[in-house]
UniProtKB/Swiss-Prot annotation:
Residues 48-577 are virion surface. It is a single-pass type II membrane protein. InterPro entries: Hemagglutn-neuramid, Hemagglutn/HN, Sialidase_sf. This is Hemagglutinin-neuraminidase. Disulfide bonds join C172-C196, C186-C247, C238-C251, C344-C461, C455-C465, C531-C542. Residues 1-26 are intravirion. Gene3D superfamilies: 2.120.10.10. Homotetramer; composed of disulfide-linked homodimers. Interacts with F protein trimer. Interacts with host CG-1B; this interaction inhibits viral adsorption and replication rather than internalization. Its EC number is 3.2.1.18. The chain crosses the membrane at residues 27-47. One of its GO terms (cellular component) is host cell plasma membrane.
Amino acid sequence: MDRAVSQVALENDEREAKNTWRLIFRIAILLLTVVTLATSVASLVYSMGASTPSDLVGIPTRISRAEEKITSALGSNQDVVDRIYKQVALESPLALLNTETTIMNAITSLSYQINGAANNSGWGAPIHDPDFIGGIGKELIVDDASDVTSFYPSAFQEHHNFIPAPTTGSGCIRIPSFDMSATHYCYTHNIISSGCRDHSHSYQYLALGVLRTSATGRIFFSTLRSINLDDTQNRKSCSVSATPLGCDMLCSKVTETEEEDYNSAVPTLMVHGRLGFDGQYHEKDLDVTTLFEDWVANYPGVGGGSFIDSRVWFSVYGGLKPNSPSDTVQEEKYVIYKRYNDTCPDEQDYQIRMAKSSYKPGRFGGKRIQQAILSIKVSTSLGEDPVLTVPPNTVTLMGAEGRILTVGTSHFLYQRGSSYFSPALLYPMTVSNKTATLHSPYTFNAFTRPGSIPCQASARCPNSCVTGVYTDPYPLIFYRNHTLRGVFGTMLDGEQARLNPASAVFDSTSRSRITRVSSSSTKAAYTTSTCFKVVKTNKTYCLSIAEISNTLFGEFRIVPLLVEILKNDGVREARSG
């Protein structure tokens, strides 16, 4: 019994001893853990300088500043990336394309000469200075958003005058014609020694040149070849065009007054000539008895022609033989164009009757005055394969002087406002199979011409007239889809008299601030305008060749007026220069 009790007591003592050692072990482990943790914290604070709560207050600010620095750096890098992309993906290919176009134009000119042995003098095809590569015959201002009339001309700039002037009081220099290609320009005018009203004899000045920039950056027109066609041939109403073989020119040959010519029974003689790069001039008479079989009078449009699809295209106009096939097909055809926000109050039937009569003015014996387009193949043989297109009078007004223009991939016909419609007209033109098709025109309501009553500048109703003056517009501003938005030109800002020449930029309804040649009483006549860009500086310029009154030496002096196109948002019309 006692043994059993002793055994139980021994087991209890052993169990208590084990529990005691377990407690001591646990306490020791806990203390060791606390010491280790404290040591670790102390080491961390010592070795890493751990922040206290007060130190953490400025951390968000520092993080924000760091973010700004990183964002700024990334933004700067993005600007660099954007500039690189613009240069590599957009500007460089465009510059290369423009350079390629100009080189190909020059090569084309050379190939024409080489293949046809057209130039035996050793003179090569000329070309403008590199600063103009890609800036001629292009859509110069492409802008979908800006107000067209926020673009305006500067004051006229001094530059080298490449146009000869009269040298006597009775001398008459008139009817300028100008065209410029990617490689060279062509210019011509008519010279009469005994006053502007003499129709019996005149001679023609014809010149070929290139655009240059001087050492100081000034633009000048450099004449390389010129000729005075002073012979027994009386060339009139000449139009010129820059082609790969030089300067092609279309003229009529006349010895009678315009009224007498329209009253004759045979077409007017016409000649296709060319001033080559070697300075030699050659010409050939066209077979007008076949080409103008249905015509009694036929004249070039005075304005420049255009080289399109290996052919040179000229505007022509004249009188049709009554009851001829060409005359009969136009019978009962007419078109009425309306002024912007200024409707004709006449009855519609009366308007139609007057519109039909406008094609047969009494001045020319009631002949139908018709618009047409003549294209000739450009080769070493002059007058080759001429094709005449006569557009329907459901599109064109009474025939008048005109100009063919090419800007970018678009072609246009300007028609002088000789009939009742005063605002400037530009007909879009498409070409195919040697013929042309005209479409409904762009009209520029503020770009008017003076005229005799009832066809004065403010006229709004159809009437029979032969009036107006040649003042062509040049396509300047386009939408990105290549639709025309605005033009540049020098108008005569008078109601009836040929007075007050003024340059401006025009949209369909209004005009920009203007640059006047002189006072509002300044007499003037024909103007023809062409725009181009100096690619190096990205500056756009426009040249207006204008007939300005010159009382001391001759009745007129032809002056090349040069302006830069500037931009000023919100500015409408003001005086400049």
